[in-house]
């Protein structure tokens, strides 16, 4: 046989051998991926505190042995503050038969639970202020619905004390909130009750969507408020520059509900929750459930610890001095 023919036969055999190896590798990879735990993570909107939750969740999952591409397949969707986008993402996770959905913020948690309930896919939520009122669990101690997670309980006593010390002459606190966010309504009820002990009057304006934020802020200013206090309202936080564009020229300072609102968004100070830590706890709970713990009986875990932060640059805009009571608080000016 001529040399050319021998080379050709050898080449064809080698190509067949390599092709078979490639097919085997693809099949092995597909089989391995099929055996990975599939987790969908749904975040309501792109703002800093929820981003911190997501960061913590990934760390918490890792702490319990679930790492994307190694022991789990994790798909992340940001709902961009749109209810319909959140609903579609949750339905997509269910249609793909995911093993779990982790939802960040109340609207995402409600969407995930509505989609996953009949499919009996466990839902673990993070940063949901009142999961009972939102219809996610029967009680904090015994969820009994197929959903559990973490709740961010704001330290209103600490927050009101801070406002009173920073602004001893203040009498009225304004709050802007979204009427469809159950967490905001619950927080305002708690804030209003706590305000009685600090001689504050709470004035609120409810809005329905982002297009009404500017109008709502203007209405609060017209109410002659002395200061604003921001809760964890996703719609308001996601459009916070619209609020400060109205309040800053009016000389009305805003106190935030967590560190990012002080470091990034223009709030003066806050008794802040640590949303990375909240996310870590959420991720670890999710990992425990994936390893066999019962989502029906795992209690909702409440995070209450807060720490004081302030922004010296924002304080200067309002000619405020740091009170002696907060000398040990953390200045987050320029920290982000």
Residue ranges of model-derived segments:
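Short hydrophobic alpha-helices and adjacent helix-cap/hinge residues
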Residues: 1-336
